[in-house]
Regions:
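A generic "folded-domain core" signal
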Residues: 23-202
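Sec-dependent N-terminal signal peptides
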Residues: 1-24
Length: 202
């Protein structure tokens, strides 16, 4: 048999197998196919945000400087950091903002913890090796449970000079355990000074 004849024979066999292959392919539902997900839109910027929308102004290492667009251009800002556990899983959110001078708190913060957190144990925040302070949870939404925190001017200075802070939560499913989440303070000083400049003078 010549090479050409052999090639023609193999081609016929291959074509004759296609209907059977199609039947096998369509007979069983495909369970390993990805249907895709919608790609995340690019973060809003000061130029693309509309009045009332939040946008990402810049980054200070792991801190995001998030602001809200206003009509007069005096956009209030805060610092945001996503907190992860030892395995790198996103667990909680930490946001801090400067307050007008003269009050007991120089800065305010919100911590959003998972709904599975044991609320009666509250949460603690420690800056480096300083003693931890306890803060209660204020309310819960479908996105998580929120603690509203106030920091004194002295504590803000500790944030600026420190290496890390630690948020500690207690899981409701394992009340005997604690989950420690590090807050990197690298870039905090520059970021805090930037958001403090957006606070209206009293």
């Amino acid at each position: 048999m010549s090479m050409r004849t052999l090639f023609q024979t193999l081609s016929v066999l291959a074509l004759s197998a296609l209907p059977a292959l199609a039947q096998e392919t369509t007979a069983e539902p495909a369970e390993d196919l990805s249907m895709g997900t919608t790609a995340a839109a690019a973060p809003l910027t000061q130029e693309t945000a509309q009045v009332g929308q939040g946008y990402l102004a810049t980054n200070h290492d792991l801190w995001e400087q998030r602001c809200e667009k206003t009509e007069d251009g005096k956009d209030p800002c805060q610092l945001f950091q996503l907190l992860k556990d030892a395995e790198g899983n996103a667990v909680a959110e930490f946001s801090i903002f400067a307050l007008p001078a003269g009050g007991p708190a120089a800065a305010g913060a919100t911590v959003v913890a998972p709904l599975e957190t044991l609320l009666t144990e509250a949460l603690t925040i420690a800056i480096d090796t300083a003693p931890a302070k306890i803060y209660p949870f204020t309310f819960c939404t479908v996105e998580g449970c929120v603690a509203r925190v106030g920091f004194t001017a002295e504590e803000v200075e500790q944030f600026k000079k420190g290496a890390k802070a630690t948020v500690t939560l207690v899981p409701a499913a394992a009340p005997e355990k604690q989950v420690n989440l590090d807050i990197s303070l690298k870039g905090f000083t520059a970021g805090y000074e930037a958001i403090a400049a957006t606070v209206p003078a009293q």
